[in-house]
Regions:
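Structured soluble/peripheral alpha/beta segments that form catalytic or ligand/cofactor-binding pockets
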Residues: 4, 84-415
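Low-complexity intrinsically disordered segments
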Residues: 1-5, 11, 71, 96
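Short, low-complexity, intrinsically disordered N-terminal modules
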Residues: 4-8, 26-27, 49
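Intrinsically disordered, low-complexity repeat segments enriched in small/polar residues
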Residues: 5-17, 77
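Hydrophobic helical h-region of N-terminal Sec-dependent signal peptides
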Residues: 72-76
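C-terminal motif of bacterial Sec signal peptides marking the signal peptidase cleavage site
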Residues: 80-82
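Short, low-complexity intrinsically disordered segments enriched in A/P/G/S/L with frequent Arg
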Residues: 11, 17-23, 35-41, 46, ...
Length: 415
């Protein structure tokens, strides 16, 4: 039975963060599918990049949304030479009740803001779904993180993962580097080791290679960027503030190499870019869902959980065929897990399989992982283990059949 978000509290396992340093280089993992049967175990809701459920802005208080709260905090501490993780049970001061956010310091300006900034924390995140000319299917994730700390060198980390439908396997790599960023007017070009990404306006490119897999992709956005919280600016109270936008539908073309064989691929991708002067907020985690439906619409849902396991914030966006955005509040959506999966690598138990319902849009969806095991154990670069996996989507809109693809990110279950 699916459990909805209403005041649901779940379990999270705290585990060691692993080594606190890694010289420039790469480590990775590759595993065959070893999924366990879905169970109806308890499910703790988390959230990732929380934005406002109030159209005029808000403050999340001590619950800095999503990656700023946990992943980036640990990462950035690592990149400047310390372990930086908070002691168990440590607390931050509670911020005032949510209030309308002040006017942003400046508006998001694109394409100029595609490039790197001098803020404390920043990342560029891509996931996508690829199909070869012979009909084979693959999912991919490529994400670059940047940390800026005063006079310290700029620090970078990156993750690259491939979900191979044919082999039933999931492979990932991680890197850290202090490569100087390279960028030009109105564009960005970044490198972490020999992995690169960049873009200008609606056109982007990605290049990465790992053990057994490589991608050389060009992406073109077919819809305007989604500026979250209306203006693309979020307040996290005492934890700082952040700019955040997404490109929810990008057409992909290029070459994928799998086990020494190169093939042309096409597909769809999703891009997130977030930056700001946000820093550590202790505990909790997030679940983030991105769905690209076959009718040309997209759905994003974020659930944020505090350290005790309570739902601290809920946010969503629905993007129609023309790129018009409807902000979704907690009362506008229902999401819950249909099963669970226990990782043989970290020992964490993750939700596995979901029901997502948007009553206002008449949408009811089922999300099923392509593979149960899509966990990244990135303790040597970002200090955490997390589940970032490709999902297959089916459902209905007003009774008519729907299908699509998506990605789900789960953090806070294992650290």
């Amino acid at each position: 039975m699916s459990k909805t978000i209403t005041l649901t509290q779940g379990k999270r396992e705290n585990r060691g963060a692993g080594p606190c340093a890694l010289p420039p280089g790469r480590v990775g993992g590759s595993r065959e599918a070893a999924g366990s049967p879905a169970g109806a175990g308890s499910y703790g809701f988390l959230a990732r990049r929380a934005s406002s459920s109030q159209p005029d802005g808000f403050s999340l208080g001590r619950f800095a949304g999503g990656r700023p709260a946990l992943l980036l905090a640990i990462l950035l501490a690592l990149l400047v030479g310390g372990c930086g993780a908070p002691a168990a049970g440590s607390k931050l001061e509670m911020a005032p009740a949510p209030t309308p956010a002040p006017v942003p310091p400046r508006p998001v300006v694109l394409p100029a803001d595609e490039a790197a900034h001098d803020n404390l924390s920043e990342w560029w995140y891509y996931t996508g779904h690829l199909r070869t000319e012979s009909g084979e299917k693959y999912g991919f994730e490529l994400v670059f993180f940047q940390g800026v700390r005063g006079q310290n060198p700029v620090g970078y980390a990156a993750h690259f993962a491939i979900t191979d439908h044919q082999q039933g396997s999931f492979s990932y790599e991680e890197k850290v580097d202090r490569t100087l960023r390279v960028q030009g007017e109105g564009q960005y070009r970044l490198a972490v080791g020999d992995w690169t990404m960049g873009g200008q306006g609606d056109d982007h490119y990605l290049r990465a290679q790992g053990k057994g897999y490589a991608v050389d992709l060009k992406l073109h956005a077919t819809k305007p960027p989604v500026l979250h919280n209306g203006a693309g600016w979020l307040s996290f109270g005492p934890a700082g503030d952040s700019y955040y936008y997404s490109r929810t539908r990008m057409e992909v073309g290029g070459v994928l190499q799998a086990n020494g064989v190169s093939e042309r691929v096409t597909g769809l991708a999703w891009m997130d870019h977030q930056w700001g002067d946000f820093i550590l907020v202790n505990g909790g985690g997030w679940d983030w869902y991105s769905v690209q439906l076959g009718d040309g619409t997209e759905v994003m849902v974020t659930l944020l959980r505090d350290q005790p396991g309570n739902v601290a914030a809920v946010y969503g966006s629905y993007v129609d065929r023309q790129g018009r955005v409807t902000e979704l509040k907690a009362g506008d959506l229902e999401v819950g897990a249909t099963g669970s999966w226990r990782s043989p690598h970290s020992g964490a138990t993750y939700p596995s399989g979901w029901k997502l319902r948007l009553p206002g849009q008449g949408i009811e969806l089922t999300l099923e992982p392509v593979l149960r095991d899509q966990e990244l154990n990135t303790t040597r670069s970002t200090g955490v283990s997390y589940w970032e996996g490709e999902v297959q989507v089916s459902g209905t809109r007003g009774g008519a059949s729907l299908s699509g693809e998506g990605y789900v990110e789960l953090t806070g279950y294992a650290r």
